[in-house]
């Protein structure tokens, strides 16, 4: 989701359209035959269980798929085999991925004003991806609570050096409850990503951040952090919403001391793969409609909504077309991206190989925001793309997915390079009230996926993919 942060800030100002026309043939866009086929595709996807069954296997059976892990390698082999069973042309594209391994992660408050004699208090903490380790015995230091980067700067080295900084920037729960969880995430994620480097600049010995997520169940949300050249690397972790509140309150009473132990390791990069599978087009086989999701995940849970659901919905598209014995006019290319979570090396490898072939990428679709009820789809590229969606929205009307939102900042991290190169890009459009309650934390488990709703996601992705593959004219770009 790294390249989606700008888009997250723009989501509230996107242009959303609802379409009301009936599904009649528009020969310059979609033939009556294509529209009839799209209705069949939607019905098969919405009523089927393929995406649900595949997401269940990836998340509950294979489990967390951290880049470089045995589980990620197993998932690559599994998905490739499913595509071969469908008769697709399958390619494993080599990708060198980070190999960061989580270790011990504990934290305790050891001193605070008014504490009972001999008391300690456990803090829910998780290491952030790519963090360096504390000593094996941990570190103990006073905590300095800051609400934002400006407050950190005002305090300066005199008040920060030798201490552990808690960035207590609050995730915007009101924005999340209004359905704009991605925008709330976009506001807070900078503290997770850049907090350690900012604190180290003033001599901090470690940084902890209030989780960039909407859980209120005392769960810490992990995610990627980054260091900066020329600034010391210090350990970095995230604490739960509730623990951040407690520490911030205790800090108003007097000094607070914390003992922090984080022992992750960064091992040498390791070889992995994107899974690429083509369902050849009948008329324009050298033009591609990408349909995709990412196969890797974080390691605190099963990576169910992030992103077993998305990748399963994506590769349900060729399964549905095979079931209905439909062949698209353009090639539908499924991609299971590797390493979205830790830097996007899979996306970068694909774009590097295909840079000279960008004009033949007709459209790109990415599913990576959960598996709740979709209300339509988002698109990026030329604003004029909006005129192409009326018939598709009407096909999706029976399941209430008629909205199309223009999001110029982009709609997906892994297809981001294609979007920036001018390829029209699409993603399912969700109400984001619940996604960030489970995002990157220990509750991202298969029970969060509803059988009916992932079928609806599959339907949106399949209708978009087949509609773009059979469009009668080029898209503006």
Please tell me what each predicted stretch does:
Residues 22-30, 34, 56, 60-177:
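Noncatalytic luminal/extracellular "stalk/propeptide" segments of secretory-pathway proteins
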Residues 29-69, 104, 219-224, 296, ...:
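N-terminal capping segment at the start of a domain
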Residues 53, 319-345:
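Short helix-loop-beta-strand segments that form the rim/entrance of peptidase-like active sites
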Residues 319, 323, 436-477:
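His/Asp/Glu-rich mid-to-C-terminal helical/loop segments that flank catalytic regions of hydrolases
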């Amino acid at each position: 989701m790294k390249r989606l942060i700008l888009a997250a800030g723009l989501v509230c100002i996107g242009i959303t359209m609802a379409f009301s026309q009936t599904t009649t043939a528009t020969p310059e866009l979609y033939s009556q035959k294509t529209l009839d086929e799209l209705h069949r595709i939607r019905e098969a996807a919405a009523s089927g269980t393929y995406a649900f069954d595949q997401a269940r296997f990836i998340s509950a059976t294979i489990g967390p798929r951290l880049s470089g892990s045995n589980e990620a390698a197993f998932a690559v082999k599994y998905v490739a085999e499913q595509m071969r069973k469908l008769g697709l042309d399958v390619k494993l594209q080599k990708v060198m991925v980070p190999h960061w391994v989580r270790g011990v992660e504990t934290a305790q408050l050891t001193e605070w004003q008014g504490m009972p004699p001999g008391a300690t208090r456990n803090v829910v903490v998780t290491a952030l991806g790519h963090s360096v380790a504390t000593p094996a015995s941990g570190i103990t230091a006073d905590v300095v609570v800051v609400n934002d980067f400006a407050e950190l700067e005002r305090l300066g080295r005199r008040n920060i050096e030798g201490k552990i900084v808690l960035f207590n920037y609050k995730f915007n729960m009101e924005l999340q409850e209004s359905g704009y969880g991605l925008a709330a995430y976009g506001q807070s994620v900078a503290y997770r990503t850049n907090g350690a480097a900012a604190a180290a600049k003033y001599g901090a010995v470690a940084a902890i951040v209030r989780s960039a997520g909407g859980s209120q169940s005392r769960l810490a949300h992990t995610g990627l952090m980054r260091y900066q050249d020329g600034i010391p690397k210090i350990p970095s972790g995230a604490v739960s919403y509730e623990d951040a509140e407690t520490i911030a309150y205790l800090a108003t009473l007097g000094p607070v001391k914390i003992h922090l132990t984080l022992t992750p390791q960064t091992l040498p990069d390791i070889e992995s793969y994107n899974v690429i599978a083509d369902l050849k087009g009948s008329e324009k086989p050298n033009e591609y409609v990408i349909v995709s999701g990412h196969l890797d995940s974080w390691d605190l849970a099963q990576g169910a909504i992030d992103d077993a659901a998305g990748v399963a919905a994506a590769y349900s598209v060729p399964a549905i077309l095979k079931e209905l014995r439909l062949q698209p006019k353009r090639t539908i290319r499924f991609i299971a991206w590797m390493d979205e979570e830790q830097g996007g090396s899979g996306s970068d490898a694909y774009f590097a190989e295909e840079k000279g072939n960008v004009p033949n990428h007709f459209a790109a679709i990415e599913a990576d925001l959960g598996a709740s009820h979709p209300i339509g789809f988002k698109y990026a590229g030329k604003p004029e793309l909006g005129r192409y969606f009326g018939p598709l929205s009407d096909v999706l009307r029976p399941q209430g997915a008629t909205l199309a939102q223009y999001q110029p900042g982009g709609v997906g991290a892994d297809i981001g390079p294609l979007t920036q190169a001018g390829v029209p890009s699409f993603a399912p459009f969700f109400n984001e009230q619940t996604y960030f309650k489970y995002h990157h934390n220990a509750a991202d488990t298969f029970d969060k996926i509803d059988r009916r709703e992932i079928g609806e996601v599959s339907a949106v992705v399949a209708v978009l993919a087949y509609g773009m593959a059979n469009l009668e004219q080029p898209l503006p770009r």
